[in-house]
Regions:
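Terminal amphipathic alpha-helical/low-complexity segments used for targeting or macromolecular assembly
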Residues: 1-68, 186-190, 194-195
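Short secondary-structure boundary/capping segments
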Residues: 13-14, 61, 107, 131, ...
């Protein structure tokens, strides 16, 4: 496969945000990743001691945080700025949200411990992987969704409103609203009816 043209006038960050192949260890992206790491550590340190301060740190870290959002540390992100979380959402310990592409989490979502939201993808071509190229696809979690502990949501997936993803499920394809999906790969096992 031919090497992508990285001299199209866009920065690696612009390429990343557009969903195109980019080089992840670009200095601008590396600095943004370090900033996110430091803010997540600051969030952890202030979580129990100073809730108001932890809320301010979360607002600095994430792209958008709705009212009443509660995130138990530790929290792991690539950049933070690509994550929006709707009001009333609860996130248990150990969320991994690799936000190379946008991650949108709706209102009143329940996220169990050690859930992973993984937007990065890597080329199948070994030469491109060796050259450190990667890309990403967005993840969208609808309103009032419950992600069970240890669930993994892969790049490009949308989960519809009111759906439940069972603990340990690996979500590789879109999940419609008002269903229960479990397993690897996640499969719909029950319809919940419209709400």
């Amino acid at each position: 496969m031919s090497t992508p043209d990285l001299n199209d006038g866009r920065s690696q960050k612009e390429r990343m945000l557009a969903g195109d192949l980019y080089i992840a260890d670009d200095p601008e992206l590396s600095a943004a990743s370090r900033r996110a790491y430091l803010l997540t550590r600051e969030y952890e340190a202030s979580f129990a001691a100073d809730p108001a301060q932890s809320r301010q740190v979360l607002a600095q870290l994430l792209g958008e945080v709705g009212d009443g959002v509660h995130i138990k540390p530790p929290l792991f992100v690539d950049y933070g700025f690509n994550i929006t979380i709707g009001a009333g959402t609860f996130v248990n310990y150990g969320l991994v949200a690799l936000d190379v592409a946008r991650i949108t989490i709706g209102r009143d979502v329940q996220i169990g411990p050690k859930v992973q939201l993984l937007t990065p993808t890597h080329p199948l071509d070994p030469d491109l992987r060796r050259a450190k190229y990667e890309a990403a696809e967005s993840i969208v979690i609808g309103n009032n969704v419950w992600l069970g502990g240890g669930a993994i949501v892969l790049a490009g997936v949308s989960i519809g409103d009111n759906s439940v993803i069972g603990a340990g499920a690996v979500v590789t394809k879109n999940v419609p609203p008002n269903v229960v999906a479990v397993g690897n790969p996640a499969t719909v096992i029950r319809h919940l009816g419209a709400h």
